[in-house]
Amino acid sequence: MKNLNKNTKIIVGLSGGVDSSVATLLLLKQGYQVEALFMKNWEEDDKSGYCSVEQDLSDAQKIADKLDVKLHAVNFSADYWNDVFIHFLKEHKKGRTPNPDVLCNQKIKFRVFLEHALSLGADKIATGHYARIAEKNGTYQLKTGLDDSKDQSYFLHLLNQYQLSKSLFPLGEINKIDVRNIAIENGFVTANKKDSTGICFIGERNFSEFLATYLSKQQGDIVDEQGQFIKHHQGLAFYTIGQRKGLKIGGGFGKSGEPWFVADKCIERNELMIVQGNHALLYHQILSASKPHWISTPPTLPLMCSAKIRYRQQSQSCMISQNDNKQIKVVFKQLQRAITPGQSIVFYDNKTCLGGAIIEFRL
């Protein structure tokens, strides 16, 4: 940001939340020409009030008015449906667990939004993500945010060189608590607004109930590791590896009295296998992943680095090698709990995000 000309026009994605509000303020303080854009990516509101488009737009407009910034409101819901949500449903139908936020960043926020912002005369876009961008000799790197507890590089690992070259992350060098304080000091209506959690189009609704409105139920058996029948499930799409909540099986059922967790899904038999406690079947050390994406030059394999198989996980030491089938093989130094097909595995070299891939199966 420091090297940009002050005549640079930046359009910031203003969501109606505290992060994008403060990001907008910081850009103005840097002296740039700033406009804002509110994205409507989903048509239906969460009735509980946690994912209200109307409320978010209202808050975004109040921030824009307070900062004297022009606000564009654009409906990208058709793009989101076609490029993100349909894929989300297809993956769940296969019994996998996709991450729509990763795809949303790649397809919507840093493609559709970027293209629209450029058509409005912007030189770059900005968002309230907690991540950093570094550039050296014309090559861009995605770095983790200064606030490790809020780092969002995991969700941004599919960005390419062009997208990074056109993007700014004003909050990358700031801690979340300081962002809140800045919002309070400036009297932002969003200062104490609850952070969005989970998938935005689901909000605080029950996940299985939401999914059931789009996917038909297919009853099958829930069995233990010995193949003993326990009860019926209503469809593999409604469960994920490592899941405990929603199984509705008391710990008293079984030998150990410990909680039950989803250990595996057998698509061919429409069977869900569950185990108790920290069972060995929940842990694996090797996985195969498809569609590897490297943010800069693809590394020479094999490669020693670290990886995350889910957001908020501490990076885990691993080695990446090439499989014969164009997939990559990842061997962790330690066993990993609940490796989940469909989820993203994201690779790091210290504070640099190298890229990632889609988990296909555990070995």
UniProtKB/Swiss-Prot annotation:
The active site is at C104 (nucleophile), C200 (cysteine persulfide intermediate). Pfam families: tRNA_Me_trans, tRNA_Me_trans_C, tRNA_Me_trans_M. One of its GO terms (biological process) is tRNA wobble position uridine thiolation. InterPro entries: MnmA-like, MnmA-like_C, MnmA-like_central, MnmA-like_central_sf, Rossmann-like_a/b/a_fold. Gene3D superfamilies: Adenine nucleotide alpha hydrolases-like domains, HUPs, Translation factors. It is an enzyme of class 2 (transferase). Keywords: ATP-binding, Cytoplasm, Disulfide bond, Nucleotide-binding, RNA-binding, Transferase, tRNA processing, tRNA-binding. Residues 99-101 are annotated as: Interaction with target base in tRNA. ATP binds at G13, L14, S15, G16, G17, V18, D19, S20, M39, G128. Its EC number is 2.8.1.13. It is found in: Cytoplasm. The record marks H129, Q343 as: Interaction with tRNA. Residues 150-152, 310-311 are annotated as: Interaction with tRNA. Disulfide bonds join C104-C200. GO terms for molecular function: ATP binding; tRNA binding; tRNA-uridine 2-sulfurtransferase activity. One of its GO terms (cellular component) is cytoplasm. It catalyses: S-sulfanyl-L-cysteinyl-[protein] + uridine(34) in tRNA + AH2 + ATP = 2-thiouridine(34) in tRNA + L-cysteinyl-[protein] + A + AMP + diphosphate + H(+). CDD domains: MnmA_TRMU-like. Transmembrane segments: none annotated. HAMAP family: tRNA_thiouridyl_MnmA (MF_00144). Belongs to the MnmA/TRMU family. Catalyzes the 2-thiolation of uridine at the wobble position (U34) of tRNA, leading to the formation of s(2)U34. This is tRNA-specific 2-thiouridylase MnmA. It comes from Ruthia magnifica subsp. Calyptogena magnifica. The gene is mnmA.
